[in-house]
Amino acid sequence: MDKTYAPVTTAQELTEALAKCRAAQEKFATYTQEQVDKIFLAAATAANQMRIPLAKQAVAETGMGVVEDKVIKNHYAAEYIYNAYKDSKTCGVIEEDTAYGIQRIAEPIGVIAAVIPTTNPTSTAIFKTLISLKTRNGIIISPHPRAKGCTIAAARVVLEAAVAAGAPEGIIAWIDKPSLELTNQVMREADLILATGGPGMVKAAYSSGKPALGVGPGNTPAVIDDSADILLAVSSVIHSKTFDNGMICASEQSVVVLDSIYDRVKAEFIKRGCYVLNAEEIDKVRATILINGALNAKIVGQSAHTIAALAGVDVPETAKILIGEVTSTDLSEAFAHEKLSPVLAMYRASDFADAMNKADTLVKDGGYGHTASVYLDTVSGKEKLDAFAEKMKACRILVNTPSSHGGIGDLYNFKLAPSLTLGCGSWGGNSVSENVGIKHLLNIKTVAIRRENMLWFRAPEKVYFKKGCLPVALAELKNYKKAFIVTDAFLYQNGYTKPVEEKLDAMGITHTTFYNVAPDPTLACAREGAAQMAAFKPDLILAIGGGSAMDAGKIMWVLYEHPEADFQDMAMRFVDIRKRVYTFPKMGEKAYFVAIPTTAGTGSEGTPFAVITDETTGVKYPLADYELLPKMSIVDADMMMNAPKGLTAASGIDAVTHALEAYASMMATDYTDGLALRSLKLIFENLPSAYENGAKDPKARENMANAACMAGMAFANAFLGVCHSMAHKLGAFHHLPHGVANALMIDEVLRFNAAEVPAKMGTFSQYDHPHTLARYAEVADYLKLGGTTDEEKLENLITAIDELKAKIGIKKTIRDYGIDETDFLTRLDSMVEQAFDDQCTGANPRYPLMSEIKQMYLNAYYGTDETK
């Protein structure tokens, strides 16, 4: 051992011992796992070999307990703790996941202050020194004054073996002359307190200003149900309660027995050597349990015969337990307290609920958070066990188990960690609610290496396209029985649904049509359609029209399949669509959804988005979830040939903004970039002719149809940005067509996003620096717009967009559309805040401040050169 070790009896000597221990720990912290494990093995071996001498010394010094049982406790503290942690990593990198970029590194805490109780003076010392050595911590022990000799002897055994195996000298120290003053000093100066003792000591530990692992008192009740194995239950309680004369804090303090088996249980206790007190004897023992309201120290760890003699009661020397049949669970009843001796309260319960109530009171009043025990048939009594586990505020619920042995773990259940310090959680005023082990003596550093998100590309299962493809694509639906068509009155009255209806008739599919969809569809409209669906019970839904009809169809689909769905929940904002709080209901279980667009713009046929308006509040609910993706999309330009100019312009420019925002999005990928670029090229080349010539240029119409769908699939996966956020609110507040609103904002957004020094950049792992200017330059290059620098290319792109807007009759400013200036300015702040909170804002490459959104609105209202 350390021959230079000086006794610690004063504050100065303790300060010196702490300094030496801290220096030793700093050296120990550099040891490898192999060195630590060698020391851990040597220390556990030495403690195990000294289990009998230490047990004898503990009983001789304290006058409490049973030598043979203390031998078992010492053996347990050495063998079971070693076995539990021999293969555990506690040095350096203890866990690594290269795929996720995570490393966990274990570091020691430093110097541990260990308070040791008189009830388990050697086994607890062995336990705490071993787990400290395994975790490369130093430890200073404050023994109980009544057990200082045996506690120090146990610590000395572990220290000698550890140093011989290579541990630094002074890594374990102790107070030779314990006092409240020195205990408080060591708790103040240590890095962590590991306190096992009475409530006063635990409270002092938590009041020291240092992190503490303190445990509370136990007052374990054991409920014996009428389904229990009585022989097992009684023998288990006796085995536990007599172990070391009841000094394990988890030992049973009372049994609560159902009335139907009470007499049989009582008889079994008597048969097995327990002594049931009569009324007079109960009073005498009651007066001996508590002295001035506190537990009588003279009964702790004594035999039943000795305690009876103290109370003036004559019992056989062989009596195992003194049992008092009592009725009150109140604190005024001495038998209802923790007794730390072979004295047991016995209660009669009318039924299991009554038994649980009694046990609950006993736990809350005397052992909150510690341990509760129950004996029952775990098969037939499963519901009772579940009820018991739910009701008891105890961190260990032991079933058919002697609680002294069961509570400390690894004896009757091998997943319960072995420990001699049992946490009681917040109920017991503790910071830990489990059996204390090595993980509680480590600081774990987490090294998180940047990783990029998993990306995806989601699209409808089938996308059919080509002018005239409608009847061929519909033929795939031949096995469906009943079709529900969703459209608007204009399309229905002008025969747009007729080709679909004729094909359905030819295939023998019964069908009906809902044609009350209006622009900006409402919840009332969707509910009306869903009610008709519920009555018709289709297995096929066909949404025919522009964005409104397809969105309405999607919402009706949701209401039809999940009438319980809450739109406020479904419209909840998300940062990552895969991590959203709300789980969207599974779609497609009742009906197969087909989208057939009649406009080239919204791209709703290829997106998981839908917007619905609550007509009572005016609130728009934007829904986004891949469950809303159509199962099939049929993009047939024949359905779009006769779209009016205004619709062609608004929907066409909407598709431009879809592609531009998808390309600039933080979540853009190679999969979406190609779609976005190709759709932009097709739009710039074909939108003017589609606008001017309509059906006279079927190729332009077809190219626009394809471009709109491709742009939709691009933003379905890359998402949109702040242009759409502002357009949504501009349209809602001032009733501008959605595509026009986007057209009015896009120039401002391009310049805003292109800033090389943004106030805030967006947050997404793949987005590592502001590069949107370069992205816009790539678009200009792809469109062959010219320019030498990225800045020139951006201006050329904006000019090209402005020229395109002019060709299709879109005005330059918001004011040009007759929006009253006073009304606009009055409602501006509300519009700004709602735009900021729009779902689309999150994917924007530049995270906008509300003041910046406001300025963009003002620029778009007055024109950039005329901004007030």
Regions found by a protein language model. Name each.
Residues 1-103, 271:
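N-terminal Rossmann-like NAD(P)+-binding subdomain of aldehyde/semialdehyde dehydrogenases
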